[in-house]
């Protein structure tokens, strides 16, 4: 083993001397101050305690002050309480800072110029020590001067090289540019990666945003963008209704960034650099009903900020499931705030000065307003809107000298922008309910405006209502279909539909979290690339599922099984098929679910797997969504007939996979319940007997007994039986679904052997399968 190197005794002695000298100096300084370290409360540097903006009951605790780093010293004689700085705490840091006094004028005589008398000052011979110090100072000055000259020479050489490089690059650019071209043409020549954006000229946007739009490959504005942007730029409140996938995000994102540029320009039209984070006030608050939609809004607006030169707007994303402290730091210097109502209100209500800061916003955007403003869902939205509109008595008193009372209303300068594809309250009625059902037109302008005016406090009496698609809520290139099946055959028909579309990115919607978990395991057991997304997942897991599903490098046949958290606003490119495993409960849910496909002019399909008990709700759904159709069909959804041969051949696969998945889920549930009972028994201090609990459960009667019995049977499957089921399923999945090819006579029938050898057609089937014609 190597020995530790000894420290040099000389250097250690030198360091100890320095420490002693510093300690003696500090002690001498404290002694010279004449302060023994014990002071009264009036001499301490107290700081005021900052209270949250929203405090329900302060109980008289106002004007509190605090101090850190002191100990309490009580006089044993009279009991007087005094304070002393803690050990290691600088004594001056706990004292009040005195006002600076002009001490120089008291000690130094003021210079009054040269005297008229020729009296010379008496000559004083410097001591030898002073002469030595002077000579050493001269040597040091010479060394410093030489070093400074060397540094200056190096800087000059670097500057010359840089100028030569710039001249060379400028000469190269000049040689490639024709004579007579302007600097604007030079800029266009350098940024040749964009597209022609002349169609945007009518909106009178800034050159910075036009450059960003060009780089994002948006050749022309959509209908909702062309209709809404001019009114928003003119300062009006806007209610925008458009079909899903029509570009509503940029319809309010572009005016917000235009205001940011206008606010940050100087008198010459140049953009000012970033301000200090502490001084920045947000210009916009955008509310979203789901975390995924909030992340997508931040991504889209952030992409435009990145592509547009000179736009340095900072975006703060406030959603649940992530660190509150980090989001508070982001909010301190944000220009645009995007978030879900719960987290936004949590940060606003617990912070100091945030509500007053947010009252100065220029834009309040409510995306997917029908969901956010629906009764009983988002109480925090009402709290946020109330806080933004609230005017405290102290606010007017504090600003009497600066502004009149008329300007204290927060709504005077704030624009309210509301966007969604559905606004009518009738769309939120449950389709399968037994109460009074109202059909008819799904969109009535007057009723929608009255509904919004009750919920939101607009600045204008009548905001601009813009409806770019008054006839139908659905996208133009969307095909809608329905598959009728038995109540216990939904898994079978879902798997068959997925086999019909092997290279289609598919989104499957269910009405419950348990169905998402079971279907994800079922499709994974059938060797399909399935992902799960629901509200009980951790936020990072939710983001991971969306990222894997939307990744360009992902399997083109990836399947995302989700609840309605993915129904609104998600803009994922390449979704070809949307399957409703459960019929949607409301018509607006169906509109937003189906809107995940056929976006931005692309084509897509939406299919409902309908059981017998769901038929009434589906008929009502069609009547609501397609009430204004000219042909007047009773059921405008196209009925799809799956090949019964295919359904029969894949049934053994689905049955085996269902048994495996049900056994795994039952074992997990039994284990979790057993652990819960065992922990409860330990907490109570009693013995846990599983057999006694089983006997007690067996004697019970009533609802749910059949389900519990099936769960118990599924959980009793042994590991060997599960291994056998998995081996049998693997054997079936290794073969293609034979739908007409004779194993003995390959050339018999209408089988194209050459096409099979070339791998043409659907790789899931062996033989010809008629397409759905849908």
From Swiss-Prot:
Residues 493-643 form the Helicase C-terminal domain. A motif (Q motif) lies at residues 198-226. It catalyses: ATP + H2O = ADP + phosphate + H(+). It is found in: Nucleus, Nucleolus. Its EC number is 3.6.4.13. Its main location: nucleus. It comes from the Eukaryota. Residues 84-95 have a biased composition (Basic residues). The Q motif is unique to and characteristic of the DEAD box family of RNA helicases and controls ATP binding and hydrolysis. PANTHER family: RNA HELICASE (PTHR24031). Belongs to the DEAD box helicase family. DDX24/MAK5 subfamily. This is ATP-dependent RNA helicase mak5. It comes from Aspergillus clavatus (strain ATCC 1007 / CBS 513.65 / DSM 816 / NCTC 3887 / NRRL 1 / QM 1276 / 107). The gene is mak5.
